[in-house]
Amino acid sequence: EKLISYGKSLGLDAYYINNVFQTILEDSVLNQQAMLQKNLNPEAMSETHRVAYLGGQGSYSQLACHKYFSRRPGKVIEMGCTSFDQITGKVESGQADFGLLPIENTSSGSINEVFDLLQHAQVSIVGEVTHSVEHCLLAMPGTELSHINKVFAHPQPFAQCSRFIQGLGDIQHETCDSTYHALKSAVETPNSAAIGSAQAGKNVGLEVVKSGLANQSENHSRFIVVARKPLQVSKEIPTKTSLIMATKQQAGSLAD
């Protein structure tokens, strides 16, 4: 309240002041948790971390990777992959130390392909990170919305921007293995566009035609970090436990 009162005297918005304060607190807590984990798992804190994720430069997975590993000491070696299977495969084989997998989104819900994969992959969940997703329609410089006749995207952005896509009418939609591949396809295909972040588009020479495409204004994706071996977790850190259960296909089986 003191901060808000003082901020108002300087002409600052109360909502803005509260957001900055909450961000500082969250950052402090996350740094403390990272330090506790470092002390408890010194063997996992090597000089380099090989991280496998979906897509390439500018993909949401890469941005989430930067956000999570920025709190860990050492250099991050990025390993862009073309499928979720490839990510877990690199972790299981020892080619990667960690894998980053999107598991749910506030607009499109759970990513079932990842849940199915976790039933068979020999990996352990060792962390998570939530990243804000801001979908934009991206095209080559000078391209107008009325000139676009084809849109490329990963299935998740298509689902998260379904209302916008429906509003485009008869424009063709083509799904890609990753947002990175969608962006490259838009670069190579005349009068086309892709759905991705503004930064991702900039990396490959695309410009924003329209922003704010998601069905929900607050659009976030939650990613899990997986490794071959589980990590010890400090008792001072609130944790989650993920369980996979199989039940009979009959009424009441979940309650039983």
What are these regions (language model features)?
Residues E1-D256:
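Domain-level signature for soluble enzymes in the chorismate/prephenate branch of the shikimate pathway
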